[in-house]
Amino acid sequence: EDLEKRANYEILNDWEGEIERSGMFRRYILRFRYGLYDTINIHIDCSMEKTLLDPDINELANDYYVAKIKVMKREEILAEKVRAIYTRHKGRDLYDLYILAVILKSKISVGLIHEKFKSYKIEERYSFASFERKVEELRRYWADLKSLVGNFESLDFDKIKEEVLDVFRNA
């Protein structure tokens, strides 16, 4: 049976031709319509850079096959997000860190954060005091999440900031 008819979806873009490239980074965006009205975008971000930790192997399964995918360990993703907070101004980095550190309780390794900074040649050294300042600087970029998160109105910057800082304070 034809999968598109059975699942009632339609791919809306040439996702293989619309790859975003930047250095050692690739983003694949798949846009499809599911049902009559729902349009869904799926972003698949791929880093071609070597990870500091060996990747985990996750399985992605459907009715037809199982794919084994190498994924960065959560602990390293968390270190990447700390690095991102030091090098750019995006509210989503704090949100992602909140999910990783507070909700998922991913391990925080200060040593790994230092290694990550070194691998990106970031001269500023991680410390809780500098991290606290960097997190506060994201306040003015918090509204950028509106278009990314469906429940944005329920996300209180101060509450999320404090919960993230509490976890890092005790790391």
Name every feature range the model reports, one short phrase each.
Residues 1-171:
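Structured mid-to-C-terminal alpha-helical surface segments
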